[in-house]
Amino acid sequence: MSAATASVGKAYALKFISGKYQGGEYPLKMERQVIIGRSSDLDMVLVEDMVSRKHAKITLTGGKITIEDLGSTNGTFVNGEKVKQARLKEGDRILIGTSILKLVHQGDHAAEMDDQQVRQRLEEAAAVHAAKSPKSSSMAGKIEEVPLPDLLQLLNTSKKNGVLVVKNVEEGRIYLRQGRVYYAVIDDNHALGPRKSFNRIVTWEAGDFELRPAEPQEFMVELEAPTEVLLMEGMRLLDEFKRIQNELPPLNSVLMLSMPMTSPLRELSADELDILQLAHNYGSLKGVLDHSEKEDVAAAEIVLGLLKRDFVRAG
């Protein structure tokens, strides 16, 4: 058995990282089947429209953990892929309806609970979650538990509609139509543009997410690229930005024209002159990135060049 595959010598559980039971865990017992669905007589009951009466089955037997879709209407997804049957490994994320469950290791000394205790613990988790977020949607959680690229892939494959609201210091909104991202905005700053907003939001590594119902809102400009392409481009730009990040001043630090400016302006290209003007007009790296027509990485690289050649200085 490969190291990546769940070993039945360990104790495992399904941890709810979104949905009604967010924060709760369902222990998995060896040589047992767990039937998941909407019907009240099943092992794990998920009462919601997108879950079939008998939706999926998880089996722990013969040295492996597997999941099987039971002919559900809306499908069963593992790590963003719709599956009929799949072998699970630790860390896998399962999407059923609006619940995301993660296969986790419980530890060698996990307390043994009977079925009634398990259900009681889940209901306690549901009560805590409801008390914290009484008005929240059924699909909500923390980015630390499910990174945004993974979440967007799940939503894309399962063709979800709605608005994914992501909050850390800022609030980002990603609009979905049949799972496809068609618009994004940060703090209602539509001037930033949907592509730049999306590329920034997907890099956030901490905060809360919530999938809200679709809004009857139209936008002048929509994103046309497939979600997979948007995600690949966003991750590429993130890698490039991290490469130069340590050389850049903090986003909100002051940028000012060098006084005296010893190098002649004629040495600068048209793009460099544009960025120099933005630095003069808005006075910070964030101001430059927000107002430049270029992607953040390209604009930041030009700022870095201007700093090194002493056309601008960071205060």
Go through each PLM region and give its residues:
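Acidic, Ser/Thr/Pro-enriched low-complexity segments and adjacent helix/loop capping patches
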Residues: 1-74, 78-315
